[in-house]
Every structure is written in structure tokens, then in C-alpha cells.
């Protein structure tokens, strides 16, 4: 093991605890390959300890007055703001995205904490004083207990902040299993929450892989599971946790289509599509992975997209003006290369080859912006979620055809349209099968006070993340009818 490189600890019952598993994995900087830390691959027994700590803490936390919980969250928000730059740098170091994008991700995480701090309002029930003569009814919200969260590598700040602040604000306790690829940020979030005054055991972190995940899904004292990640894993999480009687929300894969109409402002469309397709190296569930070019604008649109992609600076995200950082691991880079080779083999036209960018030869896991033209819906690069800076362009003649193409996908997370025509927007809104829609913008991810998630194979469950859906997910109701 490299001298001077820390081995991370689990956070259980308010204490930093060394894993007893004896197993670790390296956490490299994707831009350089340098090992930043080692993450423990913890055992199921260690997960059980965290659940016990959370269950014990729930006894008192659930009875903590809601305004007191809110004050702790307000303090937490203040600390996150004070450490904003530190957190953004840490996101860039372990994830690889540009510092500007990491800074924005920290902002989105802080906004989630701000929403959760509104717990006194969010937890309010409803009452009707006269359902019959002398009889009244009321609905009251209560926490559900110990909640488990399983988060991905691509948003190590934002996605955990979707989960544990709101769950905790609602009176629950939480066990977080962050991605073993980006574990350092999760530990820092826990440190700051403790500094804000969060009681021991309310938030716990257990690093690991399959044993920890399965432990969360099957543990009888875990009442709900929130998951963000790939579609196959999300489906497994949903089925396994549901079979063990848990409430589940699983946000999974995506293949987001951007429809560009002939009347669109192409400069706006190109700017937004470039940001949406290649920001975060394409490793996000709201990435624009398919452009559907409608009618005669296709040639000009392709030309402008390639020209804009050629201007992007590729490199270490900590360097000034870098737009496109590396993908998360060498294996993911090689997987992306295989998709590019497959796209060529299946007959798509490769108009920009990200394998040829100079940065690809560096030590990091770089792949440049890649664009395919004349892609069809029978091609693998259209069907699969590549999760990399690869953009496919499909050509059609009408909006009806464009919507048909988008709706063929088994994924339905997001979709966008670029147009000046309100009639086009209305038709798109009514007929597209997707959960989050954008008009003349590339990433229609809603703010924390609206629900976030898609349809079809992009989501398993009933209640989405964030907004009042999140409050509903993390609470249960009691109805009381009284005669006086």
C-alpha cells in the first residue's frame, strides 16, 4: 500500500471506525491515475452494526421537535456554504469532472439541504373539523424508521444530498452506502453534519460493495431504500428490497433524446446540446445522448455540433478552462472505445472521433467528445446507455417521427425540444414518454422542491426523489377520527 495514502473509515454511531474486513480498493484520481485513498470493502456484519446504531438513534431522533431538526439543517447548510470550494475540489479529485461543474454540483446539494430545512412546513398534516356532526378527522405524518441509501459515483455530492438530509429532516435515521469509486466526499459530508450538531447514529456510512448492498436490501430493520445507479442494478435493488417488505425508489438508466426542429435557434440548440452531451464526460442520467434532427436543418446542425465539440478543452478538471474531464475508470474508457468501434461497424458515420484527442494519451482515463451521424434505432449505440461523451444523431422528417424515435427507447428519464413554435411544444409535452422535459435547454433537471425521476426503465417505484414525493417517501401517515 502506498505510504501516506489514507484508508477511509466507516462512520457508525457517530464514531469513525476502521473496517475489520481486511479488504480495500484504491480510489484513483481519474485525471492522473494517482491513488487518493483506499476504501474499505466492508462486511455484512459491519453493515449490521450501522443499522443497529441507526435503530437505536431513531428512538430519540423521531421525538426531536421538528423545529430543532430544522435548526441543525440550517447550520449544516451554513457549513456546506463555508466549505463550498473545498467540497468542489474534492468532487473533481475523485470524480474527474471540471471544477466549474463540481462547483455547480455542490450548489445543487446545498439546495437540497435548504429544502429539507423546511421540515416544519413539509411535515404538516391535514385536518377537517366537521366530517360529521361533532366528529373531526386529521392526518399526521410520522417518520418510517431506518432508511438505506445507495448512491453512484457521478454525483458524489448532489445525490447523497437528495437522500439523507430530507430523510433525517422527516425524523428518520440513515445508513448510506456511497459509491466505492467516490467515497471521500461522503465522509466529509458526515463530518460537517456532525459539526452542525447532528446526534450520533442519525447518519451512518458504510463503505463496501455487494455484501453491504445486499445487507441493506434484506435487513429487517431497514424500512426503505433509495437508490440511484444503473438500470440492471436498480431493477435488482427494487425487486430484492420490495421482496423483503421495504418501500423502494430506484432511479436508473437513461437515453435522453433532444429534438431539434427546423425553426429552432441553432446557436442555442448547439450550445445546450454540447453542454448536455459532454458535460461531466457524459456520465449523468440527464445527459443528451441522442439528437433527433428534424428536416432540412440536419446538415447544418451536425456541422455546428462538430465545430463546437472541437473547441472543448479536455484535461484535468482542476486546470483553468477545462470543460471535459476523464471518465471514471480505465475500464469505462475501454468500454466506451468498444462502443465507438461498434458504432462504426454497424454503419453509423463517425463525424468526430474522441479517441484521437491528444489528452487520450495522458495518464488519466480520457476520451474526447465523439459524435455519430445517421444513427438508426436498430444500432446498439442508440439502444444502450453508454454513459460517456458519445452523441448519436438520428435524422427524421417530422416531429411525429422524432417523438416516435424517442418513445421507442425503453428508457424515459428526460427529453428536450428546440423550437420557437408553441404548438410543437404542446405536442411534445403531450406525446413524449419521459418524466423530465426541457424546452430550449439541455438538462431539464428540476430544483429540489420538485420531484426528480423518469418513467419506464428509468425508474422503479412509486414515489420519486425530491419535492413532496420525497417527503411522502420518507414518511408514513396516521389518520385519527374523533368524536367530542
Swiss-Prot record:
UniProt keyword list: NAD, Oxidoreductase
Origin species: Geobacillus kaustophilus (strain HTA426)
Substrates-to-products reaction catalysed: 3-oxopropanoate + NAD(+) + CoA + H2O = hydrogencarbonate + acetyl-CoA + NADH + H(+); 2-methyl-3-oxopropanoate + NAD(+) + CoA + H2O = propanoyl-CoA + hydrogencarbonate + NADH + H(+)
Molecular-function GO terms, alphabetical: malonate-semialdehyde dehydrogenase (acetylating) activity; methylmalonate-semialdehyde dehydrogenase (acylating, NAD) activity
The protein's name: Malonate-semialdehyde dehydrogenase 2
Residues the record lists as binding NAD(+): 153, 177, 180-181, 230, 252, 385
Subunit structure: Homotetramer.
InterPro entries: Ald_DH/histidinol_DH (IPR016161), Ald_DH_C (IPR016163), Ald_DH_CS_CYS (IPR016160), Ald_DH_N (IPR016162), Aldehyde_DH_dom (IPR015590), MeMal-semiAld_DH (IPR010061), MSDH_GmP_bac (IPR023510)
Catalytic-site annotation from UniProt: 285 (nucleophile)
Family, per entry: Belongs to the aldehyde dehydrogenase family. IolA subfamily.
Function: Catalyzes the oxidation of malonate semialdehyde (MSA) and methylmalonate semialdehyde (MMSA) into acetyl-CoA and propanoyl-CoA, respectively. Is involved in a myo-inositol catabolic pathway. Bicarbonate, and not CO2, is the end-product of the enzymatic reaction.
Taxonomic superkingdom: Bacteria
EC number annotated for this UniProt entry: 1.2.1.27
Enzyme superclass (EC): oxidoreductase
Family matches, as Gene3D superfamilies: Aldehyde Dehydrogenase, Chain A, domain 1, Aldehyde Dehydrogenase, Chain A, domain 2
UniProt lineage: Bacteria, Bacillati, Bacillota, Bacilli, Bacillales
Pathway membership, UniProt: Polyol metabolism; myo-inositol degradation into acetyl-CoA; acetyl-CoA from myo-inositol: step 7/7
GO biological processes: inositol catabolic process; thymine catabolic process; valine catabolic process
Amino acid at each position: 500500500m502506498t505510504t501516506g495514502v489514507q484508508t477511509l473509515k466507516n462512520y457508525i454511531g457517530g464514531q469513525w471506525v476502521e473496517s475489520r474486513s481486511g479488504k480495500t480498493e484504491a480510489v484513483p484520481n481519474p485525471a492522473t491515475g494517482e491513488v487518493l485513498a483506499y476504501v474499505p470493502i466492508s462486511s455484512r456484519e459491519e453493515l449490521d452494526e450501522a443499522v443497529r446504531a441507526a435503530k437505536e438513534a431513531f428512538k430519540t431522533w423521531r421525538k426531536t421537535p421538528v423545529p430543532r431538526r430544522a435548526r441543525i439543517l440550517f447550520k449544516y447548510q451554513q457549513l456546506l456554504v463555508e466549505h463550498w470550494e473545498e467540497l468542489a475540489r474534492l468532487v473533481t479529485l475523485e470524480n474527474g469532472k471540471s471544477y466549474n461543474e463540481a462547483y455547480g454540483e455542490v450548489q445543487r446539494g446545498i439546495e437540497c439541504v435548504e429544502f429539507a430545512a423546511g421540515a416544519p412546513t413539509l411535515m404538516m398534516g391535514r385536518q377537517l373539523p366537521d366530517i360529521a356532526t361533532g366528529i373531526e378527522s386529521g392526518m399526521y405524518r410520522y417518520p418510517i424508521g431506518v432508511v438505506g441509501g445507495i448512491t453512484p459515483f457521478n454525483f458524489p455530492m448532489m445525490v447523497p444530498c437528495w437522500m439523507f438530509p430530507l430523510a433525517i429532516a422527516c425524523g428518520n435515521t440513515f445508513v448510506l452506502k456511497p459509491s466505492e469509486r467516490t467515497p471521500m466526499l461522503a465522509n466529509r459530508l458526515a463530518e460537517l453534519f456532525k459539526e452542525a450538531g447532528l446526534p450520533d447514529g442519525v447518519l451512518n456510512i458504510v463503505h463496501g460493495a455487494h455484501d453491504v448492498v445486499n445487507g441493506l436490501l434484506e435487513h429487517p430493520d431497514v424500512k426503505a431504500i433509495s437508490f440511484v445507479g444503473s438500470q440492471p442494478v436498480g431493477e435488482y435493488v427494487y425487486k430484492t428490497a420490495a421482496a423483503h417488505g421495504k418501500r423502494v425508489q430506484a432511479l436508473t438508466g437513461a437515453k435522453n433524446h433532444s429534438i431539434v426542429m427546423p425553426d429552432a435557434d441553432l446557436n442555442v440548440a448547439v450550445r445546450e446540446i454540447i453542454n448536455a452531451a459532454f458535460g461531466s464526460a457524459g456520465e449523468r442520467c440527464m445527459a443528451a445522448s441522442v439528437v433527433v434532427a428534424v428536416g432540412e436543418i440536419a446538415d447544418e446542425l451536425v456541422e455546428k455540433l462538430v465545430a463546437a465539440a472541437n473547441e472543448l478543452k479536455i484535461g484535468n478538471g482542476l486546470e483553468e478552462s477545462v470543460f471535459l474531464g476523464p471518465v471514471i475508470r480505465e475500464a469505462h474508457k475501454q468500454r466506451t472505445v468498444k462502443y465507438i468501434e461498434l458504432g462504426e461497424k454497424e454503419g453509423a458515420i463517425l463525424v468526430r472521433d474522441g479517441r484521437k484527442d491528444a489528452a487520450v494519451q495522458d495518464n488519466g482515463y480520457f476520451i474526447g467528445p465523439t459524435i455519430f451521424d445517421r444513427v438508426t434505432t436498430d444500432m446498439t449505440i442508440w439502444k444502450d446507455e453508454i454513459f460517456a461523451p458519445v452523441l448519436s444523431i438520428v435524422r427524421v422528417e417530422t416531429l411525429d417521427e422524432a417523438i416516435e424515435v424517442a418513445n421507442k427507447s425503453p428508457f424515459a428519464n428526460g427529453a428536450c425540444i428546440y423550437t420557437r413554435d408553441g404548438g410543437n411544444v404542446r405536442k411534445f409535452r403531450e406525446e413524449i414518454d419521459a418524466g423530465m422535459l426541457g424546452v430550449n435547454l439541455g438538462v431539464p433537471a428540476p430544483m429540489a422542491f420538485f420531484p426528480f425521476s423518469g418513467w419506464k426503465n428509468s425508474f422503479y417505484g412509486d414515489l420519486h426523489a425530491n419535492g413532496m414525493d420525497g417527503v411522502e417517501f420518507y414518511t408514513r401517515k396516521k389518520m385519527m377520527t374523533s368524536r367530542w
